[in-house]
């Protein structure tokens, strides 16, 4: 049996970063990855990097086939770089295969050439998440039905794209494919569009999408999916929709089933997520879990912060925990992007705080005029007693950069006036934070 001080399952952000750190500290490390197409993890191969590359090229009105080619070039470069960052280190063995727990120290790795057993003093799970496929008749057997990974590898642009699910992934793909020139229809089962956002923000997003030619159908309860005359037929209670391709955007769930975590005494919840404490220990005392597999926020920067927590315990003072996280921002890379941090207005009012809500139309921002995109709105919620920012929603060009400035002020516990009176370059989108927070009375 091959013995290692650390065995890491999954080549994601936390896993690959931890592998390098431990190897540099002198540990003997094995990293197990079930697919050589996933070196580097979800973000590089089927998530952030390929989608944002396509979003960029769609905004430039690049030919779809050429955009797919460039996306592949970017992904292949980063995948190869990530592989060699680990494989070329003397203390790391990269092992291809699917890992399965035998017990809390031993793993069986299923490989085409024969199984391999590995022993790890400490084991770290970073297997990520996988697409949820709703139990709709025909969804797994009908040609032209894709998850996000499949859609990223299309050979030609669909004339009409249907999207089953109106969440953030659905919105991002809808905006992207509309920019490439597809007709897009979003089918959302709920009666409310983007329920986690304030209604004014969600309404602005819906208007922007509709102006791009995207149809949004709410209360769309799909009963079955079929194929007819080279099109996907989507059958719902009151209507039928024919599309050239259908994206299933119904969320993602932790990828744990094939691990058989129960063999190692690892508890999972009802969604298959590995149960962890504030320092990411599982219920097996020598095993940790990091990233999407824990069922928390599915962002690569959360996976990276999970790595920091584990690194601090193994090589540092052991003081870091998930409690250290304050305000976690996120961005939806539609065109223009939505970025948010902290509370919504609805959440702030429900908390009982004495608040002010201010909004600024993007059309009032000089830089937006320069960039010829005046769509959207900036919104902030301020606590009248503490003068601190409780939350912000930025729907505008470059919001994915601006939101990090707001987050830093919030995390530092500084008053909103810091942004009101800050000196920013001109003309820039960030200087609009001066104007937004000048509206606070």
Language-model regions, residue ranges each:
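Beta1/beta-strand and adjacent pyrophosphate-binding region of the FAD-binding site
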Residues: 1-12, 157-167
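N-terminal Rossmann-like dinucleotide/flavin-binding domain of flavoprotein oxidoreductases
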Residues: 2-4, 42-120, 197-220, 345-347, ...
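Beta1-alpha1 glycine-rich phosphate/pyrophosphate-binding loop at the start
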Residues: 6, 11-77, 176-196
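Flexible, glycine-rich terminal cap/loop adjacent to redox cofactors
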Residues: 9-37, 42, 49, 53-54, ...
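Rossmann-like dinucleotide-binding cores of NAD(P)H-dependent redox enzymes
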Residues: 40, 73-79, 83, 152-153, ...
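Glycine-rich dinucleotide-binding loop and its adjacent helix/turn
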Residues: 48, 127-183, 187, 216, ...
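A Rossmann-like FAD-binding core segment of flavoenzymes
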Residues: 93-96, 100-111, 118, 181-278
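FAD-site-proximal beta/loop scaffold in flavoenzymes
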Residues: 141-157, 240-317
């Amino acid at each position: 049996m091959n013995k290692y001080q650390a065995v890491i399952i999954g080549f994601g952000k936390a896993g690959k970063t931890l592998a390098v750190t431990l190897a540099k500290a002198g540990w003997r490390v094995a990293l197990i990855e079930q697919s050589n197409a996933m070196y580097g993890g979800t973000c590089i191969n089927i998530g952030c990097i390929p989608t944002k590359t396509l979003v960029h090229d769609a905004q430039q009105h690049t030919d779809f086939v050429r955009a797919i080619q460039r996306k592949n070039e970017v992904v292949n470069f980063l995948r190869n770089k990530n592989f060699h960052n680990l494989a070329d280190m003397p203390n790391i063995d990269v092992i291809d295969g699917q890992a399965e727990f035998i017990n809390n120290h031993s793993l069986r790795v299923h490989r085409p050439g024969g199984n391999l057993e590995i022993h790890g003093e400490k084991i770290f799970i970073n297997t990520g998440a996988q697409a949820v496929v709703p139990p709709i008749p025909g969804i797994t057997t009908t040609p032209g039905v894709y998850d996000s990974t499949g859609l990223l590898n299309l050979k030609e642009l669909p004339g009409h794209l249907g999207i089953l699910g109106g969440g953030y992934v659905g919105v991002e793909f809808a905006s992207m494919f509309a920019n490439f020139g597809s007709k897009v229809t979003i089918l959302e089962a709920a009666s409310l569009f983007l329920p986690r956002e304030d209604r004014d923000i969600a309404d602005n997003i819906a208007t922007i999408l509709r102006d791009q030619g995207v149809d949004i159908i709410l209360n769309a309860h799909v009963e079955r999916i079929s194929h007819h005359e080279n099109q996907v037929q989507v059958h719902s209670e009151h209507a039928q929709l024919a599309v050239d391709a259908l994206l299933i955007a119904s969320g993602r769930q932790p990828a744990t089933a094939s691990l058989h975590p129960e063999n190692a005494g690892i508890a999972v919840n009802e969604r298959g997520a590995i149960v962890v404490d504030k320092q990411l220990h599982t219920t097996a005392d020598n095993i940790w879990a990091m990233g999407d597999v824990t069922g928390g926020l599915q962002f690569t920067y959360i996976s990276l912060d999970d790595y920091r927590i584990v690194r601090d315990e193994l090589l540092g003072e052991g003081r870091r925990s998930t409690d250290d996280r304050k305000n976690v921002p996120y961005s939806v890379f539609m065109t223009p992007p939505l970025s948010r941090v902290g509370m919504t207005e609805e959440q702030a009012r429900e908390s009982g705080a004495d608040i002010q809500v201010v909004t600024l139309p993007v059309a009032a921002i000089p830089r937006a005029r320069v960039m010829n995109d005046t769509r959207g709105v900036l919104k902030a919620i301020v606590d009248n007693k503490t003068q601190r920012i409780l939350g912000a929603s930025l729907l505008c060009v470059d919001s994915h950069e601006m939101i990090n400035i707001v987050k830093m002020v919030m995390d530092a516990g500084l008053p909103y006036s810091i942004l009101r009176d800050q000196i920013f370059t001109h003309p820039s989108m960030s200087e609009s934070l001066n104007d937004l927070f000048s509206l606070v009375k």
